[in-house]
Amino acid sequence: MSENKCPMHHSAGGTTNRDWWPKQLRLDILHQHSSLSNPMGDDFNYAEAFKSLDLAAVKQDLLALMTDSQDWWPADFGHYGPLFIRMAWHSAGTYRTGDGRGGAGSGNQRFAPLNSWPDNVSLDKARRLIWPIKQKYGNKISWADLIVLTGNVALESMGFKTLGFAGGRVDIWEPEADIYWGAEDKWLDDKRYSGERDLEDPLAAVQMGLIYVNPEGPNGDPDPFAAAVDIRETFARMAMNDEETVALIAGGHTFGKTHGAGDAALVGPEPEAASIEQQGLGWKSSYKSGKGGDAISSGLEVTWTSTPTQWSNNFFENLFGYEWELTKSPAGAHQWIPKNGAGKGVIPDAHDASKRHVPAMLTTDLALIFDPDYEKISRRLFENPDEFAEIFAKAWYKLTHRDMGPCTRYLGPEVPAEEFLWQDPIPAVDHPLVDEQDVTDLKLKIIGSGLTISEVVATAWASASTYRGSDMRGGANGARIRLAPQKDWPVNQPEQLAKVLKVLESIQSEFNKSGKKISLADLIVLAGCVGIDQAARNAGVEVTIPFTPGRMDATQAQTDVESFAVLEPVADGFRNYHPTQFSVSAEELLVDRAQLLTLTAPEMTVLIGGLRVLDTNADQSKTGVFTARPEFLTNDFFVNLLDMGTTWKPTSKAEDRFEGVDRVSGQPKWTASRVDLIFGSNSQLRALAEVYASSDAQLRFIDDFIAAWTKVMNLDRFDLR
């Protein structure tokens, strides 16, 4: 056999479908993280495994590691704490409020692209340092939990009192395909900006491969005023206000140093591009020893404080105590040092006790005193170190727990007793739950209320479909659909919503007078179930819709209006709601929403078909309602969509609205959106639609619709899992 001839027929090589058709709808994001990629098996319960963990023993091992410097990657100042804080920070710091994606909740820093981002240089070493501890405790602690816990122990080992720690983060086992990190194809590009400096939604970092901002200033321009603008925008998109932002930057930069000992061109490729013998490590440097005092990461060479392994107020002392002038690191990066040679000998060397240095600051550090609003906060925290410590503790806890959902999911002995507004609190159940007879009585009340099938189904869907699997926010529990801001969202049809809620509140009030109680949150879901039950009966099928009580009603005081505003759908294909044209198509937005709802492609398909015939469009239009008998739970949507007797033509310049006409007579039959027609256009979705359009599919359609509906209604019922 020729040496040049490959003996294998590659199963995954060659040109892909997306190479041929780059705009092909990506349905693969609906089928991630399945049992096929997870080695733990379906019977593994991480929460139960974590409960058996000796957390104190893990923390003791981590504490010992902090000062156990390894020759292959020596600890700065003899302490790994600052490196581990950066590891935890950069794990959590990818979170963005726009879609709830990113964050520390899945251990995604282990995989591409995050493991190879320019901002994460050397964090590959940090994870290898904690591998022996992960190995020791095995599946009782996830990588996601261990990374955050290590950051906490690092802070505690250097004299800081943290607010607490919660376990419960479940690892993923493959890179996330659903997260849009930006359209750039080069590291540190910033095509994400338009206009004067408008950052693309939902992104929360200024350049590809950065966690937040460029520490040298916007695009490397050392302008502290401009840097403040970027800081405020990016931290706000991670749910942090100005006070939290200042505390996080100042608190984080109380410890450790940056690394820019030499020419960054001498640093090798990132982990995903490194050679196989590097064994998953990257950024191998040929500058001298490449480690310790010769390390290069960001290219900046900054140590902020004289006590870089102890909690102190020295960051603010130095920030306010000197006038600063621009200089460059040995690697050529912009940074700042005190004017007129001040501060000489104040800063210890990280690896040579005989050397001393001057304090240094990043452009983004100086933004904290150049920006007037940041300066006021910085000065207050400088003058009140106890307040600084308290705000940093709370902000750090929020940073590292923001994407975990409600505190009912939190595990372990160190969970704080205090519940915070950003956790979207819901009162605990304080009454016996309704029994089967109560549910039957309530169903009869709903049926006799005068509310239509469409109204109750649309309201229940609006309540439950706010859920985001990315950060486990939203959902039907809490009945926040009756509160600001959700009650006023156009997609929720405020007038119809107010009508439905008034009727349901009356039923609730009357029932609760009997001595038993049902929450409005439960009643909204139950009403939706009643609507589906009636619609199935209209179609000649008797069904039982699963309903599990146990939801409670949140108050307006427990609901941060600004925080919940980001959950408002800009589009919702399930309700044919597309008020604005975007650069991405309506069908792409549908798939994105389906992914946030943790739906598979079949579940998304059957829900669309059912919601259309139940007449639940947000604008009450007949777009996509391919049936002559609305409010009958039939497979008519699929039957009529796939009818070759209909031809379609766009009726809008944007080609987002269509008319279906009789192929022979030309008479109008239906109107449709792109979301409707994609189920006949996309080959994979058409294959699913054909299943439900078949003559023997009516019962399967109803069963599958009910299963998918029940899943959505219970997405935030963590107590049932």
UniProtKB/Swiss-Prot annotation:
Arranged from A to Z, the UniProt key words for this protein are: Heme, Hydrogen peroxide, Iron, Metal-binding, Oxidoreductase, Peroxidase
The membrane-spanning stretches of this chain are: none
Q: Which domain of life is it from?
A: Bacteria
Quote the EC number: 1.11.1.21
Q: Which residues hold heme b?
A: 253
Instruction: Please share the entry's free-text remark on the cofactor.
Output: Binds 1 heme b (iron(II)-protoporphyrin IX) group per dimer.
Site of covalent link Tryptophyl-tyrosyl-methioninium (Tyr-Met) (with W-89): 212-238
Q: Which GO terms describe its cellular component?
A: cytosol
Enzyme kind, highest EC tier: oxidoreductase
The UniProt entry annotates the active site at 90
Q: Which cofactor does it need?
A: heme b
* Record site feature (Transition state stabilizer), residues: 86
Q: Name one GO molecular function term.
A: heme binding
Q: Which Pfam families match?
A: peroxidase
- Catalysed conversion reaction: H2O2 + AH2 = A + 2 H2O; 2 H2O2 = O2 + 2 H2O
Q: Which residues form a coiled coil?
A: none
Q: Is Iron a UniProt keyword of this protein?
A: yes
> Assembly and partners?
Homodimer or homotetramer.
Q: Which family does it belong to?
A: Belongs to the peroxidase family. Peroxidase/catalase subfamily.
> What HAMAP family does this protein map onto?
Catal_peroxid
Q: What does this protein do?
A: Bifunctional enzyme with both catalase and broad-spectrum peroxidase activity.
Q: What is this protein called?
A: Catalase-peroxidase
This protein's species is Shewanella baltica (strain OS195)
Name of the gene = katG
